[in-house]
Structure formats: C-alpha cells, structure tokens
Amino acid sequence: MKYQLTAHEARVIGCLLEKQVTTPEQYPLSVNAVVTACNQKTNREPVMSLSESEVQALLDTLVKRHYLRTVSGFGNRVTKYEQRFCNSEFGDLKLSAGEVAVVTTLLLRGAQTPGELRSRAQRMYEFSDMAEVESVLEGLATREDGPFVARLPREPGKRESRYMHLFCDDMDTLITTVEALAPLDDDGDLRARVEALEGEVAELKARLDSLLHHLGD
C-alpha cells in the first residue's frame, strides 16, 4: 500500500487528526503544540519523549510528502501545521467521521479491540453501538484503496480480537501474514508461528524507533 509511515510519523499525524477534532480552537498546531501532543502521557501507547528538533524534522518530512501543510496567517509569526493525510481538497484518502476516529485511535495507541476503540475514540466520534464500530473496521479492512486495518488473531482467554492499522511500513506484510494464519491457529504449531510473527512486528517497530532516535541525535 502507498501509505508507508514510520512509527514517529504515525504519531505526528495521529496527533494532528486528534486535535483537529477535539480542540478545533487550537488547530492548526505549532511545533511546540505538536511536541506536547506527541509526548502526552494519556491516550498514547507507547508514551514517547520526542525532542523539538526531532518533531521539526518529522514535520518537514511530512510536508514534503504532502501529508501536512504549513499555515501562516497575517500577523502570525509562528508557523503552524495542519494535516492533509485525509479528507483534504486534493488528497485521495476520504474517511467518514467514524473512520477518522478509529484510524486516529489506532495511530495513537496501536492494536485495540472494537470495545477499546469505541471507548477511547468517543471524544472524536460517538458510536451508537458495537455493531457500528465493527462495521467501520470491516469497511477499513476491505476498501478497494486499502486495506487500512487488519484483524489480529484472538489472544488466549480474550473475547475480542484486536485490530491494527496498516499505515506503517514495518508491519504491513507481517500483519497480513498474521491475518492469513489466524483462522488456522487451533493448531499449536501454527499458533506459535502467529505469535512469532507478532513478536517480529514489535521488534521491527522497536528497531525502527531506535534508528530514528539515533538519526535525530
């Protein structure tokens, strides 16, 4: 798929999507506001500690890739940023309000169950019931221009499967493989393979974050 974000880029875009809906009076965001949003200790998994220079580099990259744009009004000396990731005038990705809420929450908190998504996304969109959440997830998983989410195998002892977004370049293929194996995980060997793939996803993500941190030093 064409959306190939790093974990840090996903965090920046997720923050802008979130603040556009939850605090429209403070949007677009300055660099400092983006730093604060990225490093929030609530509604963020994992919690990050990005520096201003790291965030500025991320913003510059995302502007060049046309996922963000700068905004500078008359008399405003501070450059601000707004997202062009979805629902922009010339962008291809069009999402409903419910889809924006789900995608944003997945970008900010990683894999989650439909129940967790309904609870955590309620500041952005109030789902009428679980069926609506599941319908949105199904739509994102089967879109012709996607898929944008994938269902992970249900963990032992859990009632619901988790869903992961597919906008990051280090997890797309692996998550697709995990999803393909999910219906077969009654077999112990296949379950072990699925768990190994999930572990590889987490390891790749950690290595990418570490590399980005060193590049920013």
Swiss-Prot record:
UniProt superkingdom: Bacteria
Cross-referenced PANTHER family: UPF0502 PROTEIN YCEH (PTHR38768:SF1)
Protein family per UniProt: Belongs to the UPF0502 family.
Segment forming the signal sequence: none
Protein name (Swiss-Prot/TrEMBL): UPF0502 protein KPN78578_10500
Pfam families documented for this protein: DUF480
Record-linked InterPro entries: DUF480 (IPR007432), WH-like_DNA-bd_sf (IPR036388), WH_DNA-bd_sf (IPR036390)
